[in-house]
Curated annotation (Swiss-Prot):
Gene (UniProt): nuoH
Full protein name: NADH-quinone oxidoreductase subunit H
Molecular-function GO terms, alphabetical: NADH dehydrogenase activity; oxidoreductase activity, acting on NAD(P)H, quinone or similar compound as acceptor; quinone binding
Enzyme class: translocase
Main location: membrane
Amino acid sequence: MTPTTVVSAAALDAEPGLDAFGNDPWWIILIKALAVFVFLMLCVLMMIMADRKVMGRMQQRHGPNRFGPWGLLQSLADGVKLSLKEDLIPRTVDKVIYIAAPMIAAIPAFFAFSVIPVGPEVTMFGVETRLQLTDLPVAVLLVLATASLGVYGIVLAGWASRSPYPLLGGLRASAQVISYEIAMGLSFIAVFIYAGTLSTSGIVEAQQNIWFAVILFPSFVIYLITMIGETNRLPFDLPEGEGELVGGFMTEYSSMKFTMFFLAEYVNMVTVSAMSVTLFLGGYLAPPPITTFWPGANEGWWPALWWLIKFVCVMFLFVWVRGSLPRVRYDQLMKLGWKILIPIQLVWITAVAVIRVLNNQEYPGYVTAIVVGVFGLLVFLGLWAWSRAAAKAKAQEAAEHEAELRARRENPMYGGFPVPPMIAPHYGTSVLAEEPRYQPASAPKREEVSGA
């Protein structure tokens, strides 16, 4: 027995539902792998196109409408254009890391989608197989790990460019991913508590009766926020803020290397959207109103259609948020991640765990109600204390600001200026009246010497 067989047997013992994987013919696995790759590339092309068209409508303009019918081939044309551009490599870069960074950012993004279930078991070319490339007992952790690996490419791109703007963009990206991945992982924990498994197909099957987005709504909302921060999209696109860092970590890149960073960003968007459908929106299961009058809605290829509809709705959220919200400041980004999302998620997970234990132990309903009431009271007291502290800090900040304005009125040079203002005394046009202005002495007249 090989080590691989031993590991597979142990995985099947731990997760009985995984016995449907690993028994497909090699050509079925190859077809599914190619289908995943083609689907991701098509999603990237269509997402870029939808991004530009929807943004155009939200800004009361047409968007790209020249290349192809209704401009649908514009993304393909942009890709061809970028591939034909000159591939410039600055002289001072660390060449090996500079070239490897785009690949490090793009390749892990494709791996994560391999554990996303798109549908149940179907018949494909006469073979019974699931619409999922593979599954693992820790599939969700695999997605979380591969999503965080991409930031290494961003950080290395900033460092290898040997330029201040890319370096700052890389540092921002690493801090942002660390901050928001903690909150994202905490939102997964609530799902694990209710599903009892970390396998993606098992989590979908656990939502047969009710979606986790309903019973775990705070975790769902926090996940939606963190997935936007994880993919560096507006309003959290600080690593590539044009007004501050030109192009951020991509400033020194061109041609296909530049394209690979964009490819990684959009593939990550596809992955986190698919994960939100899997963890919170019932995956490929039909919405409950449909299953009440159509028992066969979750059979055959129909579940793939329900999954696709949910997936498109979540992807539209990225475009809608980008067109509606302005970019936040970096301190606001860090404050949201560390001071708001993580504390709320910790309190929520504690409440979910306690309620889950009480339900499993079959305690009376009034005990659960008392626990929920105590948690609600604690949350209310915490919010009240936080609001008082915030109001006090705001009043103190306003008082300090008023004192600074008063000091500036009394002394124009208060705080110092890189360039002195025009009212400073050493400008000739604004010298005080009582100070005598310097008058240069007149030059003596030359005496003409007459010849003898």
